[in-house]
Amino acid sequence: MIVDSVSQKPTTLVQKTINIYLCGPTVYNDLHLGNTRPLIVFDVLNRVLKKAKYTVNFVQNITDIDDKIIKIAQQQEVSESVVTKQQITAYKSLLKKLNILPIKHIQITEKIDKIPDYIDQLVNQNHAYVSTQNNVYFAVNSLKQYGYLANRMVHLEETDTDKKNKLDFVLWKITTAGIKWNSKWGLGRPGWHVECAFLIDYCFKNELTIHGGGVDLKFPHHENENALHMALYNQPITKHWMHIGHLMIENQKMSKSLQNFLLAVDFLNFHDFRVLRWIFYQKHYLHPIDLNQSLIEKANNDIQRIAKTLNVARTWLVYSEQSELISPKQYDPVFSALLDNLNFANAVAAIWKLIKKINTSIKTKDFSVLREQLSFLEWSIDLLGISFKSIHTKLNVRLIKEWSILHKQKAMDKADQIRKKLIKKMLL
């Protein structure tokens, strides 16, 4: 079940094929931490849907032509493709570092030659017009549903540009700067809003299940995408909307324009990727998160606590000779929480309750119960994308078994020497 962020209504996903479109980056520089929140939230959604036996088609655009890209290319005296190729490589590397499951990426430049025909349909239906300077604009007053997403009324406002209405937005921009494409209106480039609307139409037609992005995209970007689709098909561009809350610093949205951002790659140079993911699980995805040092430290401590629980539990199962073929097992309290509109609070609470039970089983040496509890924990953290690689190497397992034998033989001095080694290795 998800709650539509526009209608505010809960919806059960009935169809077994789920089509997702998440607005992607404009690749002119590196992502800041705020940009990663939608990626991580939608990655969990993707994991949950797949575990629930849905077929998921997950598409994300990469905007690889834009005024910012052209400006940087000119400053560096290179082509736009040199800039974007470097940034796309960096972006995909970041996705791997964040443990994001594979997404189908489509670069806008790969499909631009098809966009003029899409725009021409809007012109022919009188939803778009060609200006005196041969730019093509969408006429917002041609669509009575315009303003639906943002819940605002649209009034005709005069403008001193070649647009008829201040809110009209560009579909095709005539330009002499940077890379250009041919069209019946002249050399130029498509506008940002029409790029996403076209890609959704190209990939899914009228079958998009969930459209997502940061809450700041709700207006004007998603409003304008939706308007284009409504104009052509007389129905919304997607069945459901998911908007992700801001990442804040000192009560201000983290953004490049405010110069209050921290690059994701810089954060990951000092912190485990699991720390960032865990931070985003501390609030519902709709709500803003205020990033501060205490939150980072708490998340770091939490991740270390989870890792230690896994390591110690595995060690005791080796000790008790019950460590063979432990496979992750579905844990309903975590799964149910995430199926309920990604209720991170309940999922996290369920994990802490499970860890408490694991510690009790270790104390009481109830190893058969511990074995099942560990399989629950491994399944749960995999669902959240924060799994750990086992540190129980052959050498470490041999050391644990040696400790086990000495401990059971009551050779306490020798056993304690090995125990200290195990503690140092984070195995106890």
Curated annotation (Swiss-Prot):
* Enzyme nomenclature, EC number: 6.1.1.16
Chain span(s) of sequence motif 'HIGH' region: 25-35
Q: Which Pfam families match?
A: DALR_2, tRNA-synt_1e
One Gene Ontology BP term is: cysteinyl-tRNA aminoacylation
SUPFAM superfamilies found in the cross-reference section: Anticodon-binding domain of a subclass of class I aminoacyl-tRNA synthetases, Nucleotidylyl transferase
Q: Which cofactor does it need?
A: Zn(2+)
Residues that, per the record, bind Zn(2+)? C23, C196, H221, E225
One of the entry's Gene Ontology molecular-function terms is:
cysteine-tRNA ligase activity
Alphabetically list the UniProt keywords: Aminoacyl-tRNA synthetase, ATP-binding, Cytoplasm, Ligase, Metal-binding, Nucleotide-binding, Protein biosynthesis, Zinc
Binding annotation for ATP: K256
Q: How is the cofactor bound?
A: Binds 1 zinc ion per subunit.
Gene Ontology cellular component annotations, sorted alphabetically: cytoplasm; cytosol
Find motif ('KMSKS' region) and give its ranges. 253-257
Identify the InterPro entries for this entry. Answer: Cys-tRNA-ligase (IPR015803), Cys-tRNA-synt_Ia_DALR (IPR015273), Cys-tRNA/MSH_ligase (IPR024909), Rossmann-like_a/b/a_fold (IPR014729), tRNA-synt_1_cat_dom (IPR032678), tRNAsynth_Ia_anticodon-bd (IPR009080)
Which reaction equations make up its catalytic activity? tRNA(Cys) + L-cysteine + ATP = L-cysteinyl-tRNA(Cys) + AMP + diphosphate
Q: Which Gene3D superfamilies match?
A: Cysteine-tRNA ligase, C-terminal anti-codon recognition domain (1.20.120.1910), HUPs (3.40.50.620)
Subcellular localization, as worded in the UniProt entry: Cytoplasm
Q: What class of enzyme is it?
A: ligase
Q: How does it assemble?
A: Monomer.
* Family statement: Belongs to the class-I aminoacyl-tRNA synthetase family.
Q: What is the name attached to this protein's record?
A: Cysteine--tRNA ligase
Recorded name of the encoding gene: cysS
